[in-house]
Amino acid sequence: MKVGIIMGSVRAKRVCPEIAAYVKRTIENSEELIDQKLKIQVVDLQQIALPLYEDDDELIPAQIKSVDEYADSKTRSWSRIVNALDIIVFVTPQYNWGYPAALKNAIDRLYHEWHGKPALVVSYGGHGGSKCNDQLQEVLHGLKMNVIGGVAVKIPVGTIPLPEDIVPQLSVHNEEILQLLASCIETTRNK
């Protein structure tokens, strides 16, 4: 079973890689999940570098049924990445009470690829990012994803990179992340 951790920030100065690495380690180090044989792929939207969606396809994403119908090669590549995932963990900062435009752009470039996939949202920010977490979950429901829930991780405002002493403190969220992921796994197996 393949779990994708999609990093929602593309800023040059960001803590998203550290939060995504924390989530990945939490999953990999879980004794409860060790027999699940999970393959974890961290997907960095900064590296994928999708152009801003400007209706470059003749059809809107909801009308596209095959990866080959996308006009843009980066969108075709993105479609293949998402199609290969069984479970998706969105890791996103909260910017001005919302989630980043790059993440919205990446989500909006596709449609059918998201259907039925279990998802959870790990947001972070000075207040945990609960507003963007709720917004993103609503959008994912609209894409017919099976949204299991979200975790809001509070980090010190303006701390880039995260101080070494902060990352171990994130472990208070381990159990919540693992419970949500276990629900995603169960949902995937029961499809």
UniProtKB/Swiss-Prot annotation:
Summarize induction of expression.
Induced by low temperature and by cycloheximide.
Looking at its record, which EC class is this enzyme?
oxidoreductase
Question: Protein name, please?
Answer: NAD(P)H-dependent FMN reductase LOT6
Q: Which GO terms describe its biological process?
A: apoptotic process; cellular response to oxidative stress
User: What PANTHER family does the record point to?
Assistant: CHROMATE REDUCTASE, NAD(P)H-DEPENDENT FMN REDUCTASE LOT6
Instruction: Supply the gene name.
Output: LOT6
Q: Which reaction does it catalyse?
A: FMNH2 + NADP(+) = FMN + NADPH + 2 H(+); FMNH2 + NAD(+) = FMN + NADH + 2 H(+)
Further comment:
Present with 1270 molecules/cell in log phase SD medium.
User: Which terms are listed as keywords in the entry?
Assistant: Cytoplasm, Flavoprotein, FMN, NAD, NADP, Nucleus, Oxidoreductase
Which EC number applies?
Answer: 1.5.1.39
* Binding-site residues, FMN: R11, Q94, Y95, N96, W97, Y124
Q: What does this protein do?
A: Has several reductase activities that are NAD(P)H-dependent and involve FMN as a cofactor, ferricyanide being the best substrate for reduction. May be involved in ferric iron assimilation.
Q: Where is it mostly found?
A: cytoplasm
Where found, per UniProt? Cytoplasm; Nucleus
GO CC annotation terms, alphabetical: cytoplasm; cytosol; nucleus
Q: Which domain of life is it from?
A: Eukaryota
Subunit field text = Homodimer.
Q: Which InterPro entries match?
A: Flavoprotein-like_sf, FMN_Rdtase-like_dom, NAD(P)H-dep_reductase
Q: Which GO terms describe its molecular function?
A: FMN binding; FMN reductase (NADH) activity; FMN reductase (NADPH) activity; FMN reductase [NAD(P)H] activity; NAD(P)H dehydrogenase (quinone) activity
